[in-house]
Amino acid sequence: MTNIRKKHPLLKIINNSLIDLPTPPNISSLWNFGSLLGACLTIQIITGLFLAMHYTADTTTAFSSVAHICRDVNYGWTIRYLHANGASMFFLCLFIHVGRGLYYGSFTLLETWNVGIILLFSVMATAFMGYVLPWGQMSFWGATVITNLLSAIPYVGTDLVEWIWGGFSVSKATLTRFFALHFILPFIISALVMIHLLFLHETGSNNPLGMPSNSDKIPFHPYYTTKDFLGLLLLILLLMTTALFYPDLLGDPDNYTPANPLNTPPHIKPEWYFLFAYAILRSIPNKLGGVLALILSILILMIIPFLQPNKQQTMTFRPLSQFLFWILVADLLTLTWIGGQPVEDPFINIGQMASMLYFFLMIFIMPTSCLIENKMLKW
């Protein structure tokens, strides 16, 4: 008798995606981050649902409702800090996941890669809107500054900003629509994740060698389910340690002050995971130029597959490309640091140099290194 998981219409899909999925035998722990991102999304949806039960999307009561969640709701503080720090874990896993894709040449799986970039944009939009909801000082001014960037778009910019605000400034209408969008987007992200996996399972996973592994595959369960479970335990350990011992480590103290449109904080800055893009935005003195650079800093990932002329898929056997990849990582860490600093010398110059290096590495230096390596290998 054939197993029910192989016959039942619904269980068959789950079986082919999570149990009997043919997987390369040599994928490393860096391939764990896909499942960890799924876990992060689940944690965010569950904690977010409980927070939404007690939160009120109104400018007069939003801040108080968050305080009420932390003080009066059973384990409300735990749920709130798990949600806030869960977002940080989400982005940490996202950045490693994208970095692994760049290092091992997973961008050659075009459909999977492009859906992944759309997912990245969606998660960034969701996180930004979530940061506005507590209605603290940094929430209000972050929303004002970032949405106001759209006014740089010629002709329609000002109208677009007022349309997003629902008025002539960030107000109750803005908060209400941000809450509605913040609630619905994770479910849209879940649907995109399904499409991401659908495209991935069409081609099969890449592996550290970049070699075809069709002749040598192993089932996903039990080998990679146990491996993923270990990664999940480590993620939960890190999340719990942060949420329970250092809940405000990654937050901004200004957000414990209720939003005041008459008082601007000395340094307006987003959460740590947006600082690299914020530094690129600030490094260009022109408003429209800054906005374009900000969008291109992520959108550039879409053209990476067309900029890489390498004959070997992964960087495993390409020392020059490896060296440049780690320079790129160091550059992004520098940009993250600069994004959190005030706009004054020497930070302005460092930010401009780091931003230039980021785009030069992506567009010119790394593709050139690929050509040099091809030449050295006589390919």
From Swiss-Prot:
Q: Where does heme b b562 bind?
A: H83, H182
Q: Name one GO biological process term.
A: mitochondrial electron transport, ubiquinol to cytochrome c
Q: Which keywords annotate this record? A: Electron transport, Heme, Iron, Membrane, Metal-binding, Mitochondrion, Mitochondrion inner membrane, Respiratory chain, Transmembrane, Transmembrane helix, Transport, Ubiquinone
Which cell locations does it reside in? Answer: Mitochondrion inner membrane
| Binding residues annotated for a ubiquinone, in chain numbering | H201
Care to name a GO molecular-function term for this sequence? ubiquinol-cytochrome-c reductase activity
Q: Name one Pfam family in it.
A: Cytochrome_B
Cofactor descriptive note: Binds 2 heme b groups non-covalently.
TM ranges are 33-53, 77-98, 113-133, 178-198, 226-246, 288-308, 320-340, 347-367
Which residues hold heme b b566?
A: H97, H196
Q: Which domain of life is it from?
A: Eukaryota
* PROSITE patterns referenced in this protein's UniProt entry, alphabetically: CYTB_CTER, CYTB_NTER
Q: How is this protein organized at the quaternary level?
A: The cytochrome bc1 complex contains 11 subunits: 3 respiratory subunits (MT-CYB, CYC1 and UQCRFS1), 2 core proteins (UQCRC1 and UQCRC2) and 6 low-molecular weight proteins (UQCRH/QCR6, UQCRB/QCR7, UQCRQ/QCR8, UQCR10/QCR9, UQCR11/QCR10 and a cleavage product of UQCRFS1). This cytochrome bc1 complex then forms a dimer.
User: What PANTHER family does the entry give?
Assistant: CYTOCHROME B (PTHR19271:SF16)
| Misc | Heme 1 (or BL or b562) is low-potential and absorbs at about 562 nm, and heme 2 (or BH or b566) is high-potential and absorbs at about 566 nm.
Would you identify the family this protein belongs to, as annotated? Belongs to the cytochrome b family.
Q: What is this protein called?
A: Cytochrome b
The encoding gene is: MT-CYB
